[in-house]
């Protein structure tokens, strides 16, 4: 724990904020929700002691339940709510992560709209949505109720437009620069696009002169010193 938190301080010292328990909360490394929740609580406690008062956003999902236990809208809402409430109680911002349980029950766009609508309305503060593509996780194919990316985009944009006062932004991890650039043009002006594109992030962050993506991706941790200097130069 000491080394884990020390690394977060190194990032904060450079003026960066933190997205906590994202990859770990997907359990790819075998980290369960009990451990992830402790990581979230420890990071938020440390953040409060840091002089720069960094922002910490944390991944909320449904993975403390098996998919076979999440066969109804009520069960999915309850599972998401448990993680969101824990994050909010600890003082963090919620990132609503994609749940494998939704494609598993072949949820249509109306189901996504109802579940996300409920979660957004109960959120204490604006949240970040996360659209993780099947290139990262094949079990998420068909998210937002459509296999077709254009139709899925329209579905999630409808959710955002209906609840934009409760949405800080949306992180997109599809590895498709053209799609991301087109999608962010359609967002309400006060909703951010957070890129998760590990291949095209420099161009997406730099923007096209009118729109740009914010950075929310793991590669930044590995190149933080160089990245901070680059961002400072870009700001000039």
Located regions from the model:
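Active-site beta->alpha loop and helix N-cap motifs at the rims of alpha/beta catalytic domains
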Residues: 1-150
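Catalytic alpha/beta core domains of metabolic enzymes, predominantly
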Residues: 124-236
């Amino acid at each position: 724990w000491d080394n884990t938190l020390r690394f977060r301080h190194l990032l904060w010292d450079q003026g960066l904020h933190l997205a906590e328990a994202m990859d770990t909360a997907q359990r790819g490394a075998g980290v369960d929700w009990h451990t992830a929740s402790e990581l979230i609580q420890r990071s938020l406690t440390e953040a409060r002691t840091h002089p720069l008062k960094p922002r910490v956003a944390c991944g909320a999902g449904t993975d403390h339940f098996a998919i076979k236990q999440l066969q109804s809208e009520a069960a999915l809402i309850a599972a998401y709510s448990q993680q969101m409430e824990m994050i909010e109680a600890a003082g963090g911002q919620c990132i609503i992560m994609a749940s494998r349980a939704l494609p598993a029950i072949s949820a249509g766009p109306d189901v996504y709209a109802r579940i996300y609508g409920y979660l957004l309305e109960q959120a204490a503060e604006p949240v970040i949505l996360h659209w993780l593509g099947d290139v990262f996780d094949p079990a998420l194919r068909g998210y937002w109720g459509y296999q077709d990316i254009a139709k899925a985009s329209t579905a999630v944009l409808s959710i955002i437009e209906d609840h934009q006062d409760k949405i800080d932004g949306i992180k997109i991890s599809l590895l498709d620069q053209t799609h991301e650039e087109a999608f962010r043009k359609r967002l309400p002006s006060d909703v951010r696009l957070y890129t998760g594109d590990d291949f095209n992030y420099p161009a997406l962050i730099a923007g096209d002169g009118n729109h740009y993506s914010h950075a929310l991706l793991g590669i930044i941790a590995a190149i933080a010193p160089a990245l901070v200097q680059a961002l400072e130069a870009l700001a000039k």
